[in-house]
A protein has these predicted regions:
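Catalytic or ion-coupling anion/metal-binding cores of large enzyme and transporter domains
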Residues: 1-183
Length: 183
């Protein structure tokens, strides 16, 4: 059961067209595993954009919490953090203006939560970059939406993972000159 069905169920109980027991049955299947829900809500949106910025490893935005790949990625992330310390690479070296722009364009391409605009502008500000709404509007007008995930469709974050995740999205955006891949 996706969250939209659950939200609708709550309204149906209030309207008297569904029983509380029926709603409870929906609740029991809404988010059946650990991790976030499978829709493109704030948690998954920011996870994908954190990957785009470069503050998490490729694949981290879409690998489900219950997969072995997530455990392997966690180990790899720990190793990478130690390398970054040795290399004296700081978040300010990673969160560049171009990385923020890439994240904003990726946001538009995959239809992230509207909350991401608040988070991305705050991240940009903290990193010393000035991103205003006019610039965001320009990105939105020029960046194609290349996929729609739940709640905008019946496609879930796990489906995006199955077709290559954020690296695949970024590759498509780079083909169109929408982003510049950052090593």
């Amino acid at each position: 059961t996706d969250l939209n069905t659950l939200f609708d169920g709550a309204g149906k109980v209030a309207a008297g067209t569904m029983t509380a027991d029926e709603l409870a049955a929906l609740e029991d299947t809404a988010c059946p595993t650990c991790g976030s829900c499978s829709g493109m809500y704030t948690a998954n949106s920011m996870n994908c954009l954190t990957e785009t910025i470069g503050m998490s490893l490729p694949g981290s935005g879409t690998i489900p919490a219950v997969m072995s790949a997530r455990l392997r990625l966690a180990k790899e992330a720990g190793e990478r953090v130690m390398d970054l310390l040795k290399e004296d690479i700081k978040p300010s070296d990673i969160i560049t203006e171009k990385a923020i722009e890439n994240a904003m364009r990726t946001d538009m391409a995959i239809g992230c939560s509207t909350n991401t605009i608040l988070h991305l502008t705050a991240i940009a500000h903290a990193a010393g970059h000035d991103i205003d709404l006019a610039r965001l509007d320009a990105y939105g007008r020029k960046t194609p939406q290349i996929c729609k995930l739940n709640p905008a469709s019946s496609v879930f974050i796990t489906d995006l993972n199955d077709v290559g995740g954020i690296p695949a999205v970024m590759k498509e955006l780079a083909k169109g000159g929408m982003i510049i891949p950052i090593a």
